[in-house]
């Protein structure tokens, strides 16, 4: 009986989702950041800054499956650890 109970406990632990979930920063505005828990398949955090007008940049960021493409006047950084997209 103890063996059956131990087997059930081990099987339960193995069947649980013990995967790691990445957390990224989202940039709501220039000074306000919140966190976002990434969905399955989104294994990158990105930060994107682009010029609104000369001397001012607007931030964007969050979770992504692939690093976003860079366009002119834009800075894009991607990383793979929690809250790394400052």
Swiss-Prot record:
It comes from the Eukaryota. Disulfide bonds join 24-45, 38-63, 67-78, 79-84. Keywords: Disulfide bond, G-protein coupled acetylcholine receptor impairing toxin, G-protein coupled receptor impairing toxin, Neurotoxin, Postsynaptic neurotoxin, Secreted, Signal, Toxin. Residues 1-21 form the signal peptide. It is found in: Secreted. InterPro entries: Snake_3FTx (IPR003571), Snake_toxin-like_sf (IPR045860), Snake_toxin_con_site (IPR018354), Toxin_cobra-type (IPR054131). One of its GO terms (cellular component) is extracellular region. It holds the Pfam family Toxin_cobra-type. One of its GO terms (molecular function) is toxin activity. Expressed by the venom gland. Belongs to the three-finger toxin family. Short-chain subfamily. Aminergic toxin sub-subfamily. Binds to the muscarinic acetylcholine receptor (CHRM). Monomer. This is Muscarinic toxin MTX6. It comes from Ophiophagus hannah.
